[in-house]
Amino acid sequence: MTIEVRNLVKKFGSFAALDGVNLKVDNGELLALLGPSGSGKTTLLRIIAGLDWPDSGEVSFNGEDALAQGARERHVGFVFQHYALFRHMTVFENVAFGLRVQPRAVRKEEARIRARVKELLDLVQLDWLADRYPSQLSGGQRQRIALARALAIEPRILLLDEPFGALDAKVRKELRKWLRSLHHEINVTSIFVTHDQEEALEVANRVVVMDKGRIEQIGSPEDVYESPATAFVHGFIGESIELPVRIDDGVVRLGERPLRLAADGLAPGASRLFVRRHDMLVGPPGTGAFEGAVRHVRNFGPVQRAEVALFGGETIEIDAPRDRELRAGDRVGLEPRRYRIFAG
């Protein structure tokens, strides 16, 4: 099932939740909508599901107008952050629910329903919990059951709204790998919403980065991380250093200090320099584009996170290998291995 969104606009009063969004999701794709709160990602998901309606624009499934259909007719499976399981039903009954409430004309006979539920519980590797109630399950188990229930009706599209947001970090990491593997098995066109960049980069085939109701960039996880298209994407994905610089006569300046950085093709005026923390290489004073003094050092597993006061007035944090053995008071030269400069 392919999904296409064209010029989608949705406002809540004067607030534009979606501002001219265009997007195509390919058949069998696992796509992540990534962005901060208020970026429009959940609003977009709800409109695709038929749970909300745009002020203008088009949504099509395989070329057919989806906005002419209600939520039931769209045949979409939806997984919420907080499971939405029925507490008074067993795991088996929860998964069977969607099949048992289908219109009589399309409802399967009970034996086929039971076979389908067993198949799904095997798929999510929780067949041994069929007779348990939601209160007897862990958070990760509940979310797997919620996903099995969404798949029971054999949806054309699977939508997931912050599916792992209510789980602890260890369980979230386990379920990311599981979801990627499961999607490979079921091959259903799927979209999931998240504000967790690590989750989006690890799970999705493509990532859509959103901010303020607009799409900032669409690309593979590698593309959006290695080649951010805008200052917002660079600042939102990964841990970046951001410095206010100016381009004057082909020279990059931090305050009044010229930096030995290429400025070819950059327009003169105020700009922003972005460098990943781990891309700032540490050397002796005088050896890099920047110089500064180490103020404070903290150890994080294999790296040191050092706070460095630059000779130019700015203070930054860098990540260096532990064997570099930085100490407070050290004077250092810093050379960005990779960097991007954006106007504005």
Curated annotation (Swiss-Prot):
InterPro entries: AAA+_ATPase (IPR003593), ABC_SmlMolc_Importer (IPR050093), ABC_transporter-like_ATP-bd (IPR003439), ABC_transporter-like_CS (IPR017871), Mo/tungstate-bd_C_term_dom (IPR008995), P-loop_NTPase (IPR027417), Sulph_transpt1 (IPR005666), TOBE-like (IPR024765). Keywords: ATP-binding, Cell inner membrane, Cell membrane, Membrane, Nucleotide-binding, Sulfate transport, Translocase, Transport. This is Sulfate/thiosulfate import ATP-binding protein CysA. It catalyses: sulfate(out) + ATP + H2O = sulfate(in) + ADP + phosphate + H(+); thiosulfate(out) + ATP + H2O = thiosulfate(in) + ADP + phosphate + H(+). Pfam families: ABC_tran (PF00005), TOBE_3 (PF12857). Belongs to the ABC transporter superfamily. Sulfate/tungstate importer (TC 3.A.1.6) family. Its main location: membrane. Part of the ABC transporter complex CysAWTP involved in sulfate/thiosulfate import. Responsible for energy coupling to the transport system. NCBIfam families: 3a0106s01 (TIGR00968). Its EC number is 7.3.2.3. It is a peripheral membrane protein. Residues 3-237 form the ABC transporter domain. It is found in: Cell inner membrane. It comes from the Bacteria. It is an enzyme of class 7 (translocase). GO terms for molecular function: ABC-type sulfate transporter activity; ABC-type thiosulfate transporter activity; ATP binding; ATP hydrolysis activity. ATP binds at residues 35-42. One of its GO terms (cellular component) is ATP-binding cassette (ABC) transporter complex. The keyword Cell inner membrane applies. GO terms for biological process: sulfate transmembrane transport. The complex is composed of two ATP-binding proteins (CysA), two transmembrane proteins (CysT and CysW) and a solute-binding protein (CysP).
